[in-house]
Amino acid sequence: MRASQGLAWLLVAGLSIPAGAAGKTGNTPGKYVPWGDDEVDEIEVVKTFKFADYTGVSVAPLDTTKAPPGEGKEAKNVQGALAGVDESFLTGLKKGISSYSKAPVEPGAGSGHALVIKGTVVDLNPGSKGARMGVGFGAGAAHAKLTGEVVEADTGKVLLRFTHEKRAGSGMSFGGGNSRNLMLKSAEHVGEDLGKVFKVF
């Protein structure tokens, strides 16, 4: 569910949103839906922290066991994307963090006073190649959705939780685009957006 749809559902249901929680790039404890101007679908700050105090960021292997395996002709592309999603997410995270910091970002469980991202792939969806070829206006886009948490390597304390989805290949494209590549590009965008979150901490 996209953030705007989620907010609309809350209003219809008569549920309240904590003051200051919607559309804010906050770094204090609380849940932000979305975080920023749709920059990240959902961020929960569990504990305030200072990014500069940490030696770097490590990314544990993503849990892909909960992601649908794909169907029909696209099953092979989904499996290929699942096999490469760690690298794409890491690439995006490096891009996001390097835009403001020289902190090292590397795969692994992390050690010392570093941040560790432990993520789960909720969905890698190939979208519709036919719709990408002929319809346009965002139709048929492939997408990736991830959820996870950021913890301290040395203490195991959870500092932040996130859920985010990105799309790639929307609109008309020649041949509809390769769905595997588009799913991986979506995962890269998720990583990049998350990497930029640390800038406000």
Regions found by a protein language model. Name each.
Residues 23-33, 100-157, 168-177:
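Surface-exposed short loop/turn segments
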Residues 1-9:
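Bacterial N-terminal signal peptides that target proteins for export
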Residues 74-80, 139, 145, 151-200:
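Short secondary-structure boundary motifs at beta->alpha junctions and helix caps
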Residues 68-70, 130, 159:
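Generic domain-boundary/flexible-linker signal
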Residues 90, 94-102, 126, 167, ...:
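Sec-exported extracytoplasmic/periplasmic mature domains
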Residues 20-91, 196-201:
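A structural "domain/chain start" motif
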Residues 61-66, 123, 162-168:
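Short, small-residue-rich loop/turn micro-motifs
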Residues 8-16:
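Bacterial N-terminal signal peptides
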